[in-house]
Amino acid sequence: MESEFPDTDEPVWILGRQHHLNEDKSKLLLDVSARLWFTYRRKFSPIGGTGPSSDAGWGCMLRCGQMMLAQALICRHLGRDWQWEKHKKQPEEYHRILHCFLDRKDCCYSIHQMAQMGVGEGKSIGEWFGPNTVAQVLKKLALFDEWNSLAVYVSMDNTVVIEDIKKMCRSPPQSSSTAHSSAHLHRSALGRNRNAAGLCTGWKPLLLIIPLRLGINHINPVYIDAFKECFKMPQSLGALGGKPNNAYYFIGFLGNELIYLDPHTTQSFVDSEENGTVDDQSFHCQQAPHRMKIMNLDPSVALGFFCKEECDFDNWCSLVQKEILKQQSLRMFELVQKHPPHWPPFIPPTKPEVTTTGAELIESTDKLFELEEEFEILSV
């Protein structure tokens, strides 16, 4: 595992951007240090009240999932080419993104929320997660994140279904009929179908996660070119993977080496300041990232992509047709137009209409009981 980049004419690819080491190494390092870097932390409030107060030794894949999602949020709010500079004042959205991941039970993508959501996926708190479990947990937590309003699609059986993604991302038009006015009120109270500006949009930004097994015990060399191709796509969010019980966030490659951010450093819990900003020094990796030979990768991985607009998704589909599906056999994954008839029907996931999480967002209980006929009232 090397750190310093060699002098070479080969291009380096980082999350859809190409860098040339012999021209400007510092630009590459700036690009890497702009990524949010999440590591093990200690001294946070115990998970679930009585659980662990550090994730050292078990939380590495959760941290990698946080890094991939944070990269999607940066692309959504600040753009792929946004740069982080030490001690420079950052936009409010940046602090808001960072706040989503602080180690507190009230932050939507905190280690607390992820570990507890993992219980529903059969993982006890403090147990190591694989890439697919993290993907399922992010998909569930995203339903409670109204600010970002992401559609999270996790592929099944190595197959991405275009029809299902379009169904999920094309926000349903708001009904104007009076019969639905109370539901309508309720939805706006919960902020559903609305973006940050309160407007209904035609496409929910898509976080697409593709869990894959690229071999049995070792990565099959037949997949290597296609795997590397994914890091060149402008929609790339890299990949989750590593070695058994040792997760890394892969952000690019140089030749036959993968470039990754490593969560295996234990830092102390950092909370936000009273004004909402976060002391962010420890959330950016300020040295050259690690590299490992692609053949040493465990075959269980999850690829990530972010499509802010529908045209980004259409562009991704044509890149996949061209680069991934050109192999006649042993394709890395399949991209199909129609939902396979033998699969159970696709139902876009929705957040329960009334939950304890949503309750604080409803101004008064009167409004809640107007809805009795339309929604079963869950315990609030």
From Swiss-Prot:
Question: What InterPro entries does UniProt report for this protein, alphabetically?
Answer: Papain-like_cys_pep_sf (IPR038765), Peptidase_C54 (IPR005078), Peptidase_C54_cat (IPR046792)
Motif: LIR; annotated at 375-378
Domain comment text?
The LIR motif (LC3-interacting region) is required for the interaction with the ATG8 family proteins. Required for proteolytic activation and delipidation of ATG8 proteins.
- Give the residues annotated as active site: 60, 262, 264
Organism encoding this protein:
Gallus gallus (Chicken)
Please provide an example of a Pfam family that matches this protein in its UniProt record: Peptidase_C54
Name the Enzyme Commission number(s) assigned to this protein.
Answer: 3.4.22.-
* Record's protein name: Cysteine protease ATG4A
